[in-house]
Amino acid sequence: MRFYFGKEEMSSLISPYDFTEVTRQLRSFFDEKGFQEVHTQNRLSILAACEDPTTVATYEYSGQIWPLPQTGQMWLEYELLTKPELPGCYCLSTSYRQEQNPTEGRHELIFPMFEFEAPGNFKDLLQMENDLCKHLGFKCDHGRSPFTEDFPGGNYMSMVAHYAAADNELLAFHESRMYEEYGDVFFLTEFPEYTSPFWNMKIGGTGPKDVKLANKCDVIMGGMETIGSAERATDVQEMKEQFYTISNGEYANLLFDLFGKDRVELELFKFLSHNFVPRYGGGIGVTRIISAMKRAGLIVND
């Protein structure tokens, strides 16, 4: 069933059986690792907007304008950076994405998201996501493009070449082809800077023509990006520079236009005042992981 506001489709209704089954499995995985659950939905933040500035919507509350939250990531970062004894933390929240041209079956304008943050590096992130996929029941029955311990994958630029992608950009139909070629799970990593990785993602090495590469991993599940994750940056100057230049500067300028430059920079500089340590994090689209698990025959609540 779809939910409409006027004539505009907003989101689909999620079966409580599917939602309970998937979130139970996600929680159990992170609970076993000693992660703490954080309630982020009652925390207001300007930086709770993702990297695509065209999807940001706003609301007025208590006399101020705020962005409808798209991620709880910054609050998980806050908990991790102010409580270094934590082995990790996670949250389950609602993400509002005002997609300009949503694709049916792929984009939800409002959806639940399960997010996590933990100390560690990019290698630790890939291992954790490998283990999470196994925990959820995913398997790989072939040896094509082995990448992690149990699943196939490849870096962004190699997959651009593999599919001869126009404009050096991978699109939704390329993700569908990854499913057809490699199966239920594919690890897509090392995104070039021109794809506008979020401003607090760590820039690792360089690719062809000295293109900077972010330590970012999208886990393609059931033919769609389902887990978006990355190693976080520790260099304050690097994060500051990326904040002002992401999406060709549109991200910062849109936030300035909506909420005022002084207000935005106050929140940014407060975040950048933390003592940064190696860490990683990511977000899991709950509707997409339900879809992927159904496609793999791992959910049979219908």
Give the ranges of each region predicted by the language model.
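Short, hydrophobic/aromatic alpha-helical segments in well-folded domains
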Residues: 25-26, 128, 267
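A glycine-rich phosphate-binding loop feature that marks nucleotide/adenosyl-phosphate handling sites
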Residues: 43-47, 145-153, 191-193
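Short amphipathic C-terminal alpha-helix that caps PH/PH-like domains
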Residues: 126-137
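Short amphipathic alpha-helical segments
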Residues: 18-22, 121-128
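Flexible helix-coil linker/hinge segments at domain or subdomain boundaries
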Residues: 136-148
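A translation/RNA-centric and nucleic-acid-associated enzymatic feature enriched
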Residues: 54-119, 123, 153-302
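TRNA-binding/sensing appendages of the translation machinery
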Residues: 1-55
